[in-house]
Amino acid sequence: MKLLILDRDGVINYDSDAYIKTLEEWVPIPGSVDAIAQLSKAGWTVAVATNQSGIARGYYPLATLEAMHARLRALVAEQGGEVGHIVYCPHGPDEGCDCRKPKPGMLRAIAEHYQIGLEGVWFVGDSKGDLEAALAVGAQPVLVKTGKGERTLEKGVPETTLIFDDLAAIARELI
């Protein structure tokens, strides 16, 4: 199985320091939906692992998050692709859960879902927490310069991190 795991906000869609709280605020980064569809059509399983503490903070209900993910799935399907397993952490940063990145709980849940190990699997993110979660499970950390990626890069990243401009560049590399 060829598995690619993506963070959501800042990788697939535009991010906001004020959170993505409505379906209208969920706007794909140009090329990201096409990249997921192309990867899927080329035999890649594309899963998503996303921190969504806005739920715990009361900024939006679970139904809104599910609508965003349904929109993502529909947009990718329109281009002939498929989004695999989507996992999210609804907890706030002080709740002590095992799923909120940089903890690796969501990545482990994806591995369990697909019954595979994560050694060498690419986990694409735009933050230090994403890269740390990848390293915690032996996955390959991959940074995109979209979202918070440029700021993350300026602060320094683990030396094994692969760096790409965006998700479309990753698709070109892997296909």
Swiss-Prot record:
Its main location: cytoplasm. It catalyses: D-glycero-beta-D-manno-heptose 1,7-bisphosphate + H2O = D-glycero-beta-D-manno-heptose 1-phosphate + phosphate. The keyword Metal-binding applies. SUPFAM superfamilies: HAD-like. The record marks R100 as: Contributes to substrate recognition. The active site is at D7 (nucleophile), D9 (proton donor). It is found in: Cytoplasm. Substrate binds at D7, R8, D9, D15, S16, D17, A18, Y19, T50, N51, Q52, S53, R100, K101. One of its GO terms (cellular component) is cytoplasm. Keywords: Carbohydrate metabolism, Cytoplasm, Hydrolase, Lipopolysaccharide biosynthesis, Magnesium, Metal-binding, Zinc. The keyword Translocase does not apply. Zn(2+) binds at C89, H91, C97, C99. Pathway: Nucleotide-sugar biosynthesis; ADP-L-glycero-beta-D-manno-heptose biosynthesis; ADP-L-glycero-beta-D-manno-heptose from D-glycero-beta-D-manno-heptose 7-phosphate: step 2/4; Bacterial outer membrane biogenesis; LPS core biosynthesis. GO terms for molecular function: D-glycero-beta-D-manno-heptose 1,7-bisphosphate 7-phosphatase activity; metal ion binding. It comes from the Bacteria. Its cofactor is Mg(2+); Zn(2+). Pfam families: Hydrolase_like (PF13242). GO terms for biological process: ADP-L-glycero-beta-D-manno-heptose biosynthetic process; lipopolysaccharide core region biosynthetic process. Its EC number is 3.1.3.82. NCBIfam families: HAD-SF-IIIA, Histidinol-ppas, PRK08942.1. Belongs to the gmhB family. Monomer. This is D-glycero-beta-D-manno-heptose-1,7-bisphosphate 7-phosphatase. It comes from Pseudomonas putida (strain ATCC 47054 / DSM 6125 / CFBP 8728 / NCIMB 11950 / KT2440). The gene is gmhB.
